[in-house]
A protein has these predicted regions:
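Transmembrane alpha-helical interface segments in multi-pass membrane proteins
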Residues: 279, 292-346, 367, 371, ...
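N-terminal Sec/SRP start-transfer signal
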Residues: 1-32, 44, 48, 320, ...
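A short beta-strand structural signal in non-transmembrane regions
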Residues: 55-61, 141-142, 205-241, 249-250
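Hydrophobic alpha-helical transmembrane segments of multi-pass inner-membrane transport and secretion
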Residues: 15-42, 262-301, 324-331, 375-378
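Hydrophobic secondary-structure segments that place a key small or acidic residue at a functional site
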Residues: 87-88, 97-107, 118-203
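Hydrophobic, regular-secondary-structure patches
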Residues: 26-104, 109-110, 120-131, 143-144, ...
Length: 400
């Protein structure tokens, strides 16, 4: 502890070099924290969905395939099913914003039974059921867009050739890890609009867009099961029922369904870990070069220290501690700073519904800090060994 002032003064001896080393460390770690947090959040959302006992049915050929709306009623009648709802992605524009938030066409009667972690006031839910053009939005979406009950919410069709002129009838809330930026509107209203486009295109003699011909498509079916142990058998039963139909299905748990999106991006886990390793290697070179230059400038000073009685071990300790101090400051700014930044700045509204929330957990922040300390230790080890074993005579020759 008595050498801390000396170590601190050495770290400040070349302020430009120290600041650049700290800045490079903090920026690299800040970006690495974002990548690790993104992977952790995707995994966390998938794992937390286990407790809700839900399975998801989609077309066996992927999202491009159709799931007839009639399947929802048939699945609802199966043993072990609490409720089922269509969950059809709309993907419209709001005030010319492309993909501003997630939008789904659902069954007003069952959606909040299936998604029972979401809560909405009974009178608002009743208004949603009674008004065909009504919608229920998340509390965070209402806050972001300054929407309230009775406000219009026009969505311009992008994937579909129809516009949804909605009215906010309810605002739902939910757990901290739930998506509270969704817009849920009635499937029957959406389907009727698609049918009108199909009919008008056919009567006019023109070819209707492919999406307009897909009225009656549930997209996916979210199914609430009574217990978790029946989910595998129930999923198999659903798939067996439609195996030989024109629209075979694939049913999986909500956890597997959520992880499927990450799998669509490729081997995301390996890519993120590879980038993280590259960041660590780059930091080793940056910090190592900075410490090597610092030790070359202090050859005479190290020789004087050893001449007045400083042991090799003490010289080694002083150099290593300086390297760890510089890297640790960069790590604190980058890793802990990212934690504080994303705790106060919510970037989820700018992800178009892809991420319901974003934060850097303490585990990831501490991991980043540990990485910076390792970088400091590893980058300072070689210069410290050279300094500890340097010749006093050769060092003092440079004294003028």
């Amino acid at each position: 502890m008595k050498y801390f002032r000396y170590i601190f003064r050495n770290a400040r001896r070349n302020p430009v070099r120290s600041v650049l080393t700290i800045a490079s460390t903090s920026i690299c770690l800040f970006l690495m924290m974002i990548l690790l947090a993104f992977f952790a959040i995707n995994n966390e959302v998938a794992v937390e969905s286990r407790i809700y006992n839900r399975i998801v049915t989609m077309n066996a050929n992927g999202f491009a395939g159709m799931v007839p709306i009639a399947f929802v009623g048939e699945v609802s009648k199966m043993d072990g099913v609490v409720a089922a709802t269509p969950f059809s992605w709309f993907g419209g524009k709001y005030h010319d914003e492309v993909m501003p938030f997630s939008q789904f066409a659902v069954d007003a009667e069952t959606i909040f039974t299936v998604m029972d972690e979401l809560t909405v006031a009974p009178d608002q839910l009743e208004a949603f059921k009674e008004n065909k053009d009504g919608c229920v939005i998340g509390s965070k979406l209402a806050r972001d867009r300054q929407l309230k009950l009775g406000d219009p919410l026009p969505l311009k069709g992008d994937l579909y050739p129809v516009d949804m002129n909605l009215t906010v009838r309810g605002i739902y809330s939910g757990p901290a890890r739930a998506d509270q930026r969704m817009c849920l509107f009635r499937f029957d209203y959406f389907d009727e609009a698609l049918k009108r486009v199909t009919m008008s295109s056919a009567s006019g003699g023109s070819l209707a867009p492919a999406s307009a011909k897909r009225s009656g498509n549930a997209g996916t079916i979210f199914i609430k099961c009574k217990t978790a142990d029946i989910m595998p058998s129930l999923g198999k039963k659903i798939d067996d029922l439609y195996r030989n139909s024109d629209f075979p299905t694939r049913t999986q748990t909500e956890e597997a369904f959520s992880k499927m999106f990450a799998d669509m991006l490729g081997d995301l886990k390996s890519a993120i870990y590879g980038i993280g390793l590259a960041v660590v290697v780059a930091l080793l070179f940056v910090a190592g070069n900075a410490m090597a230059m610092a030790m070359r400038e202090r050859t005479t000073e190290v020789a004087v220290l050893k001449a007045i009685g400083f042991s090799k071990g003490l010289v080694l300790f002083l150099v290593l501690t300086e390297a760890v101090l510089v890297a640790g400051v960069g790590g604190a700014i980058g890793a802990l700073g990212s934690k504080a930044f994303f705790d106060y700045v919510d970037i989820a509204p700018y992800t178009g519904g892809f991420l319901p929330f974003f934060y850097v957990s303490w585990n990831i922040a501490i991991l980043g800090l540990c990485v910076s300390l390792f970088v400091g230790l590893a980058s300072g080890l070689f210069p410290a060994i050279l300094a500890a074993n340097s010749s006093v005579i050769n060092g003092l020759r440079k004294v003028v």
